[in-house]
């Protein structure tokens, strides 16, 4: 079975290692994904997220950090031309199927990287970015998230049902859909998701979110969201992070177990339809006790 995984934070991890003076190889490394394991797992396509922090003490410039990760992406393509192929279009996927190579597609996790500039958004598209979240865990000029760093142990907690998309955020959604860049609602507030359901003219994705009825974490989607997204033909990606799978009230003991993955997967299919379920593992960017 060919694997298409639409979220990992490998580019950020490679950048952090490079900044620390301890660069890691993409061929084989101690992360959760490398080229050797892509081959072993029969990967067809891996979406490579440019993840950036908005905290000034973490990044001098979110846009510069994003561009540095895009540079790493292109250097990987240059380093492994016989093994890797960039995917920008549906036609590229058809070519990929007969190429014997592994595909990689650029995405962005944190719309704040654009610094509220539609021009920057279009430039990222020109560089190959084909999917972007409006937020990570920080409020930005586009929208508000459902959680903030340091509060993940506050579980369950009220969802953000009032802070949705800003006017600039609505402009971004319109431009992304014009460009055919996928809008990713993972990390977005409840209010923001409903804003997008109201204005979106094309299907969108929740790249790494589970079912809130199965685990009452605000990063997961409500029944009403699942149904509405199913009706719009959206994709909902199962997230393997233990915090979004396990209902153990002792949050220090949560585990990422296959039984919970299957429980969430079945529930999402029941509410949104089997064509809506995808496996966007978030396989790099999570920690904890992982069974898979």
Q: PLM ranges: what are they?
A:
Residues 1-158, 216-292:
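N-terminal hydrophobic targeting/anchoring segments and the immediately downstream early-domain regions
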Residues 8-10, 187-190, 211, 285:
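Short, glycine/acidic-enriched loop or turn micro-motifs at the edges of active sites
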Residues 192-232:
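Aromatic-anchored, glycine/proline-accented short structural segments
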Residues 159-209:
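Loop-centered beta-sheet repeat module
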Residues 188, 209-211, 239-243:
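Histidine- and/or cysteine-centered catalytic micro-motif in compact active-site loops
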